[in-house]
């Protein structure tokens, strides 16, 4: 009887230790912290990639980073699959939030920006972020909170 209780307790501990890890991720998604990640090799523009991620699972979006450890995890997943390439991440229209000024200190009032939106792609080898035309096509990573 004691072995049965001890064995049952051991299984309960094992089950609880798996909660919040890969056991909660959809199949073929990878887990890190409380999130699931999936690398998609097909190339899409930023808007289509974000829409594709949203269609995968409720709450899924293009990748966002919140720590250097998370970056290391994502690089470990993307680099072997995509080699030296860019992936779309969930940043776009970064210039709209900036207060720009000229080198002489005056505020930017007149501008001649292109109508093309700028989105951010991360380089798989070193996670450097690059602005790219949102209409370009790249692979991407979807992220899902579990």
UniProtKB/Swiss-Prot annotation:
Signal peptide positions (record): 1-23
Disulphides: 25-36, 53-142, 119-134
Chief place of localization: secreted
Keywords: Disulfide bond, Hemostasis impairing toxin, Platelet aggregation activating toxin, Secreted, Signal, Toxin
GO MF terms held by the record: toxin activity
Domain of life: Eukaryota
Keyword Endoplasmic reticulum: no
Additional remarks: Monoclonal antibodies to glycoprotein IIb/IIIa, to bovine vWF, and to bovine serum albumin did not show any effect on the binding of AL-B to platelets.
Summary of subunit composition and partner proteins: Heterodimer of subunits alpha and beta; disulfide-linked.
Protein name (Swiss-Prot/TrEMBL): Snaclec alboaggregin-B subunit beta
Taxonomic source organism: Trimeresurus albolabris (White-lipped pit viper)
Lineage: Eukaryota, Metazoa, Chordata, Craniata, Vertebrata
């Amino acid at each position: 009887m004691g072995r049965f209780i001890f064995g049952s307790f051991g299984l309960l501990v094992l089950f609880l230790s798996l909660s919040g890890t890969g056991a909660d991720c959809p199949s073929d998604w990878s887990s890190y912290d409380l999130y699931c990640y999936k690398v998609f090799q097909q190339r899409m523009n930023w808007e289509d990639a974000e829409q594709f991620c949203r269609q995968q699972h409720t709450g899924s979006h293009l990748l966002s980073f919140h720590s250097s450890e998370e970056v290391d995890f994502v690089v470990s997943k993307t680099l072997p699959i995509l080699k030296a390439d860019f992936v779309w991440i969930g940043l776009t229209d970064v210039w709209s939030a900036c207060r720009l000024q000229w080198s002489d200190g005056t505020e930017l009032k007149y501008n001649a920006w292109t109508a093309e939106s700028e989105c951010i792609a991360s380089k798989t080898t070193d996670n450097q972020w690059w602005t790219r035309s949102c209409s370009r096509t790249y692979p991407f990573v979807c992220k899902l909170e579990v």
